[in-house]
């Protein structure tokens, strides 16, 4: 089980990314615009650097919804491999069955 502070930190990162999404997209558009002046592009880079570090979506980590485990996360279920296996063994995931060959 992950620490509550780690789960809270991840929730904070998601909120910051949502809050600054439009501003980051706007600045990145200016930076990648070849028609913009060098000064405008440089100012956009500087403004992008002043935004909070955690507002970048690449800082987010997928975590298991039940345990908060950051590794072995399966996006399809939103759970870690351990919890997916436990749920599958109890028959709680429709259409999922153990492989046998």
Curated annotation (Swiss-Prot):
Q: One GO term of the cellular component aspect?
A: cytoplasm
One GO term in the molecular function aspect is: structural constituent of ribosome
UniProt xrefs under Pfam families:
Ribosomal_S14
**GO-annotated biological processes:** translation
UniProt keyword terms in alphabetical order: Ribonucleoprotein, Ribosomal protein, RNA-binding, rRNA-binding
Quote the PANTHER family the UniProt record gives: 30S RIBOSOMAL PROTEIN S14, SMALL RIBOSOMAL SUBUNIT PROTEIN US14M
State the function annotated in the UniProt record: Binds 16S rRNA, required for the assembly of 30S particles and may also be responsible for determining the conformation of the 16S rRNA at the A site.
Its family remark reads:
Belongs to the universal ribosomal protein uS14 family.
Q: What is the name of this protein?
A: Small ribosomal subunit protein uS14
Provide the gene name from the record. Answer: rpsN
């Amino acid at each position: 089980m992950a620490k509550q502070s780690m789960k809270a930190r991840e929730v904070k990162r998601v909120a910051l990314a949502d809050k600054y999404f439009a501003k980051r997209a706007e600045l990145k558009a200016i930076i990648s615009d070849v028609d913009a002046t060098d000064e405008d592009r440089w100012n956009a880079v500087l403004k992008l650097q002043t935004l909070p570090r955690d507002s970048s979506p690449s800082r987010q980590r997928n975590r298991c919804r039940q345990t908060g485990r950051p590794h072995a996360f399966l996006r399809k279920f939103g759970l870690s491999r351990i919890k997916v296996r436990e749920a599958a063994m109890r028959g709680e995931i429709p259409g999922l069955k153990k492989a046998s060959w």
